[in-house]
Amino acid sequence: MAKKVTGMIKLQLPAGKATPAPPVGPALGQHGVNIMGFCKEFNAKTADKAGLIIPVVITVYQDRSFSFILKTPPAAVLIKKELGLESGSGVPNRTKVGNITKEQIRKIAELKMPDLNAATIETAMSMIEGTARSMGVVVVE
């Protein structure tokens, strides 16, 4: 018989650096999940992705066990990593912070493809381009 789901928790955590401190502790504690167990498992699975923010969806079951699914990092994080930026522009319509090429966008789109609601790589690329523009990054050919 399948386990009964009692909760779904969505978090964005730095890869390999989950600790029982907020936001992890309070989010999992209210569902009665073993916080250290989650932190150890998450850190082990994301150790190779250091420096990235990893979204995770945690499913909590009635017997207080859990399972989690790792998603791909947000597009904005991947764009900042690709261009070596600290942050995007506060006023993207006036201040531009960098340039990104179509090849770099294709690389990010291919990485994000499993989590994007896009049928083709071209639509995924246009989504990533929109994110880049809203960060103050100019898309060049």
UniProtKB/Swiss-Prot annotation:
Is Transferase among the key words of this record?
no
- Role noted for this protein: Forms part of the ribosomal stalk which helps the ribosome interact with GTP-bound translation factors.
What is this protein's name?
Large ribosomal subunit protein uL11
- SUPFAM superfamilies hit by this protein: Ribosomal L11/L12e N-terminal domain, Ribosomal protein L11, C-terminal domain
Q: Which GO terms describe its cellular component?
A: cytosolic large ribosomal subunit
Q: Which domain of life is it from?
A: Bacteria
Regarding protein family, the annotation reads: Belongs to the universal ribosomal protein uL11 family.
